[in-house]
From Swiss-Prot:
Protein name: Peptide chain release factor 1
Similarity comment: family membership: Belongs to the prokaryotic/mitochondrial release factor family.
UniProt cross-references to InterPro entries, sorted A to Z: PCRF, Pep_chain_release_fac_I, Pep_chain_release_fac_I_sf, Prokaryotic/Mito_RF, RF-1
Gene from which this protein is expressed: prfA
Tagged with keyword Ribonucleoprotein: no
Keywords: Cytoplasm, Methylation, Protein biosynthesis
Length: 360
């Protein structure tokens, strides 16, 4: 714990240093540097304020401990002990709050996301489950006050999705939905199953932070763009002009096709938005994989092939395999009531980071 408080003191020292720098005329005259340092100071202000309060509380605890060694009447002794009990409770709470504030911040947490849902193993049933997941996330987003835009979709004849791409915008979307990347398994009796047997199918979900030009610089020379005619479910012809767009990022081989928008220009813009996010995610994931090779994380935010959750319809049960969470309220989860699952994942991630922070 001493190392932890050494880190905390270093943050407090940096805060003081930033205060001095921000009053330096040379820094004030450099607006870009001034804004950068102001942001850094703002990011650690709450941590330093709580740390200062923590030091005041521990000082009061020491004073009360000393008082108890003096000759006090019964009433005074009881008052000091009661005060000490409250101070120790406050100290424990402050330690918890400070530890949370000291956890490494994910720079993408405030971003909007691009979510890709694919029907995987299981044919028509997998595509129908992909549609169910789309509805689940859409309802959850609505509960959060977020906006959902369908960027592209590839429908099947049974009303499911081979693939659907969403852009979800709002407050801290990535911070809550980043844990959804992975393979989602469903166990239920398909509508086409006459014998009433339970089948297992899979859909995969990919969650990427929406990337801006400032996040990643993609050279236009690295992109090959092809245009083709749009087609609907089952090959139905939609557009006689070549409005659909396929973009290939040559250095990574990432391909994005877009045909859901009304014009080639709109498809180009949307394809570029998705491509930027995928390329950003590609390089971020590569860095994360190198990091994870050193520290194995239980609550991952990446590999789409990793089975993360099972939805058992006959037993109305959902299980998140990463944290061993089982809820017997699948009907409510599929209706967008995801808070209990997501909150548990956030807490597990925080606990893991906390343990790492105190052990380092």
């Amino acid at each position: 714990m001493d190392k932890f408080f050494d880190k905390l003191q270093a943050v407090a020292d940096r805060y003081e240093e930033l205060g001095e720098l921000l009053s330096d005329p040379e820094v004030i005259s450099d607006s870009q540097r001034f804004m950068k340092l102001s942001k850094e100071m703002g990011n650690i202000r709450e941590t330093v304020e709580k740390y200062n309060h923590y030091k005041e509380v521990t000082s009061q605890i020491e004073e009360n401990d000393e008082l108890l060694h003096e000759k006090l009447d019964d009433e005074m002794n009881a008052m000091v002990k009661d005060d000490l009990k409250n101070l120790n409770a406050e100290k424990d709470q402050l330690e918890h709050e400070i530890t949370l504030l000291m956890l490494p911040k994910d720079p993408n947490d405030d971003k909007n996301i691009i979510m890709e849902i694919h029907g995987a193993a299981g044919g028509d049933e997998a595509s129908l489950f992909a549609a169910d997941l789309f509805n689940m996330y859409s309802k959850y987003a609505e509960r959060q006050g977020w906006q959902v835009e369908v960027a592209d979709r590839n429908e099947t004849e049974v009303g499911g999705f081979k693939e659907i791409v969403l852009i979800i915008s709002g407050d801290k979307v990535y911070s809550k939905l980043k844990y959804e990347s992975g393979a989602h398994r469903v166990q239920r009796v398909p509508v086409t199953e006459s014998a009433g047997r339970v089948h297992t199918s899979t859909a995969t979900v990919g969650v990427m932070p929406e990337a801006q030009d400032v996040d990643i610089d993609i050279d236009q020379k690295d992109i090959r763009t092809d245009v083709f005619r749009s087609s609907g479910a089952g090959g139905q012809h939609i557009n006689k002009t070549s409005s659909a767009v396929r973009m290939t990022h040559l250095p990574t081989g990432i391909v994005v096709s877009m045909q859901d928008q009304r014009s080639q220009q709109q498809n180009r813009a949307k394809a570029m938005e998705i491509l930027r996010a995928r390329v950003y995610d590609y390089y971020q994931s590569r860095e994360q994989n190198e990091y994870d090779a050193e520290r194995k994380s239980a609550v991952g935010t990446g590999d789409r092939s990793e089975r993360i959750r099972t939805y058992n319809f006959p037993q109305n049960r959902v299980t998140d395999h990463r944290i061993g969470l089982t809820l017997n309220k699948l009907d409510r989860v599929m209706n967008g009531e995801l808070d209990e699952v997501i909150d548990a994942l956030v807490l597990a991630d925080q606990a893991e980071k906390m343990e790492r922070l105190t052990n380092e």
